Amino acid sequence: METLSQDSLLECQICFNYYSPRRRPKLLDCKHTCCSVCLQQMRTSQKDLRCPWCRGITKLPPGYSVSQLPDDPEVIAVIAIPHTSEHTPVFIKLPSNGCYMLPLPLSKERAMLPGDIGCRLLPGSQQKSLAVVTIPAEQQPLQGGLPAEAGAEEPDRRGVVKSSTWSGVCTVILVACVLVFLLGIVLHNMSCISKRFTVISCG
């Protein structure tokens, strides 16, 4: 594999999107890496996966999906490194009880540990107005194993296709309505202009 910078190691070199739980870094037989979404798109147009760089072929047995290809362990190791500092604790104010919570490590299901374990009260003078920040799944670091959503990659993709198809249909209908409206205005103005000339010439 070529020598890549740290940033280019974190993104798919086909679509230039960062790797995420939805865009997992998949290792081809030739040892090149692509995201699972790009490989899935390649798979729809060809039987076997052909590497875009070296043209090496990765054969998938019948019934195998792209999600069953191995993850690239080097990329997973880089992505899984936590980026928070031990010297800057973050407290989150819980709206339900006014408690300030120190976030604890996430479980495999990406859920906070339950109960008072994660709740640390601060003295009144140190309490600040903080809000919970939700990190999109695209930007969350990958864990070592496959996420629970990996098996649901196909239905998720179908939902996106249905959604984009529906928005395309709505766009076409909206454009057609606007064109009919504008045509109506033009025809109305033309009929008014022709009547005005008729009245003037007759009168």
Swiss-Prot record:
Superkingdom per UniProt: Eukaryota
MF-aspect GO terms: small GTPase binding; ubiquitin protein ligase activity; ubiquitin-protein transferase activity; zinc ion binding
Catalytic activity reported: S-ubiquitinyl-[E2 ubiquitin-conjugating enzyme]-L-cysteine + [acceptor protein]-L-lysine = [E2 ubiquitin-conjugating enzyme]-L-cysteine + N(6)-ubiquitinyl-[acceptor protein]-L-lysine
Principal location class: membrane
EC code: 2.3.2.27
Keyword terms of this UniProt record: Lysosome, Membrane, Metal-binding, Transferase, Transmembrane, Transmembrane helix, Ubl conjugation pathway, Zinc, Zinc-finger
Entry keyword Zinc: yes
Pathway membership, UniProt: Protein modification; protein ubiquitination
Zinc-finger keyword on record: yes
Cellular compartment(s): Lysosome membrane
Span of zinc fingers (RING-type): 12-55
Annotated PROSITE patterns: ZF_RING_2
GO biological process, one term: negative regulation of TORC1 signaling
Listed GO CC annotations: lysosomal membrane; lysosome; organelle membrane
UniProt xrefs under SMART domains: RING
Lipid bilayer topology: Single-pass membrane protein
Function description: E3 ubiquitin-protein ligase that acts as a negative regulator of mTORC1 signaling by mediating ubiquitination of RagA/RRAGA and RHEB. Catalyzes 'Lys-63'-linked polyubiquitination of RagA/RRAGA in response to amino acid starvation, thereby regulating mTORC1 signaling. Also mediates monoubiquitination of RHEB, promoting its association with the TSC-TBC complex and subsequent inhibition. Also mediates 'Lys-48'-linked polyubiquitination of target proteins and their subsequent targeting to the proteasome for degradation.
Family per similarity comment: Belongs to the RNF152 family.
The name this protein goes by in its record: E3 ubiquitin-protein ligase RNF152
Organism this protein belongs to: Gallus gallus
Lineage: Eukaryota, Metazoa, Chordata, Craniata, Vertebrata
Gene name for this UniProt entry: RNF152
